């Protein structure tokens, strides 16, 4: 039975979509790994090899959908969709929760199973490209560099400019208080 690897990118971001990818490889591809362990250049090279040598699907959940449904429900919907699209495959999701879908899970699967590593790369590269496009619309937020994650620069931009249309309004930023200047 073929393995269908599943992973997501953007889950913990403060802005932008979450991308969830599923991938069945037609042939082995050398160098697959957890996307976070690869350079951006290598991820892009592998992205093109993966898209040419696999059957894959990438699902995006907007910041509005994440705010309305929650991350768990978004992931549950993606996993159920992948069960239909990749019927007959053994589905393996990187993590420790299957969100009630019956999909198999494995912690650090993106570094252990090449199909999950491929899904990790598909999700990360596709989401990063979207965030670079948003950077052109909101250059003051620096999305090109931090991709919407809660870096110091991103938190400072939120303090200075407020949230924008791709901000996740439901995310509470712990230990973040805009500084107040006393006169």
From Swiss-Prot:
Gene Ontology cellular component list: cytoplasm; ribonuclease H2 complex
Molecular-function GO terms, alphabetical: manganese ion binding; RNA binding; RNA-DNA hybrid ribonuclease activity
Cofactor binding remark: Manganese or magnesium. Binds 1 divalent metal ion per monomer in the absence of substrate. May bind a second metal ion after substrate binding.
Catalysed transformations (reactions): Endonucleolytic cleavage to 5'-phosphomonoester
Domain RNase H type-2: 1-182
One GO BP annotation of this record: mismatch repair
EC id: 3.1.26.4
Coiled-coil parts of chain: none
Class of the enzyme per the UniProt entry, highest EC level: hydrolase
Primary localization: cytoplasm
Binding site for a divalent metal cation: 7-8, 94
Subcellular location: Cytoplasm
UniProtKB keywords: Cytoplasm, Endonuclease, Hydrolase, Manganese, Metal-binding, Nuclease
Tagged with keyword Cell inner membrane: no
Function of the protein: Endonuclease that specifically degrades the RNA of RNA-DNA hybrids.
Family: Belongs to the RNase HII family.
Record protein name field: Ribonuclease HII
Lineage of the organism: Bacteria, Pseudomonadati, Campylobacterota, Epsilonproteobacteria, Campylobacterales
